[in-house]
UniProtKB/Swiss-Prot annotation:
Residues 379-442 form the TRAM domain. Keywords: 4Fe-4S, Cytoplasm, Iron, Iron-sulfur, Metal-binding, S-adenosyl-L-methionine, Transferase, tRNA processing. Monomer. Its cofactor is [4Fe-4S] cluster. This is tRNA-2-methylthio-N(6)-dimethylallyladenosine synthase. It is an enzyme of class 2 (transferase). Its EC number is 2.8.4.3. It is found in: Cytoplasm. It comes from Pseudoalteromonas translucida (strain TAC 125). Catalyzes the methylthiolation of N6-(dimethylallyl)adenosine (i(6)A), leading to the formation of 2-methylthio-N6-(dimethylallyl)adenosine (ms(2)i(6)A) at position 37 in tRNAs that read codons beginning with uridine. One of its GO terms (cellular component) is cytosol. It catalyses: N(6)-dimethylallyladenosine(37) in tRNA + (sulfur carrier)-SH + AH2 + 2 S-adenosyl-L-methionine = 2-methylsulfanyl-N(6)-dimethylallyladenosine(37) in tRNA + (sulfur carrier)-H + 5'-deoxyadenosine + L-methionine + A + S-adenosyl-L-homocysteine + 2 H(+). Residues 144-376 form the Radical SAM core domain. [4Fe-4S] cluster 1 binds at C12, C49, C83.
Amino acid sequence: MSKKLHIKTWGCQMNEYDSQKMAELLDATNGYQLTDDATDADVILLNTCSIREKAQEKVFHQLGRWKLLKDDKPDLIIGVGGCVASQEGDSIRQRAPFVDVIFGPQTLHRLPEMIKQVQGDKGSSVVDISFPEIEKFDRLPEPKADGPSAFVSIMEGCSKYCTFCVVPYTRGEEVSRPVDDVLLEIAQLAEQSVREVNLLGQNVNAYRGDTHDGEICYFSDLIRLIAAIDGIDRIRYTTSHPVEFTQDIVDVYADVPELVDHLHLPVQSGSDRILNLMKRGHTAIEYKSTIRKLRKIRPNLSMSSDFIIGFPGETQDDFEATMKLISDVGFDMSFSFIYSARPGTPAADLPDDVTEQEKKERLYLLQNRITQMAQQISRQMFDTEQRILVEGPSKKNPMELRGRTENNRVVNFVGPHTVIGQFVDVRITEALPNSLRGDLIRTESEMNLRREIAPSAILTKAASLEPKPDTINEIGVATFVP
């Protein structure tokens, strides 16, 4: 009988990626097969997130439910990973002594040894929440594609130390994967028919990966190299930081058509005073200047962002500045949250002087405004021709197919299942609140998807690029040095 593994994942897309790698690793080394049923599992892992309020208590509530399973099955292995584990490892050990393995985001590659150690020494537990230098990627098996789109982590951690954020304390400072490792993983995915990659990192555009000859590959260089990989026709990335959005990255949008017309660039607030309190390192006008440059190159670029509502000291004027920035930029989507203090962060020491009622009212107004903008953009797409990557059957109607536009809109349409994993052109016939409908007008066999520039030319261009200094970009935003 095969051994079963159950993983529950909370939080960001990086956590989703890490959970996928855990499953692949434990399958390759120990033959564990994933199950959706925790009661059927031999190993249960909880991959946690510490961004939201009461994250720790949520973890202990979940562990309390799993303790009942362990009472009935003493050999069950329970592990806790992710950012809460990194931040609260000792507390988890004390409050939940039945947990066998506690590991951080940078030590998940050691899971097979940890589990083996616990199984060999009944009643013992293992805690490893250290920050080894991104060695986990050297220990992971070859990636397994799950559809035509895939996530690839290119760097870990963040060195910006925004006053509200726990990431530098839970995932460590910025460390980039060597460029050859990233390109190999993407090439392996392309061989498995992946057509779109989404590059992941807490501060992805701060990427500075080592090359085989001891040089530094910057994020803009990396994008050009990825675009040269045969079969990769779309490139996305998340999450980026405005301070790191240098001119060379703006320039990539002019000469790499594989880079999509959609950008997620968190701003958090439109008030310079609040941005300063957050230690974001830029102003609202500098943020908008970057967007203006991008839209000169890509007029149809759609934007999404993160917003924190009710940061300590936020006045009505500060909130109005955020609403003005939203109107000026024209966001398509947002991840917006009411501020809650994270233990150990500098902002936790500030007086939380915005009432809950004010926070809720402001959040409602902000989300309503962005929803209106998103609906307007959807209506503007009516009767336009859109190229979409077909991901699979529609989630609501299995007789239809589902694809995604460059600007990250889901389109449902009727078509043959043979086009799953391929690009098709559709004409948008209906704009719904959360998706679009379209009619199939062209399949990939009728397109010319060959790039006009040969891959060798792209590689030559990337190799000839001069190193970029970590100084000041064109709009006067200094690269942050902690």
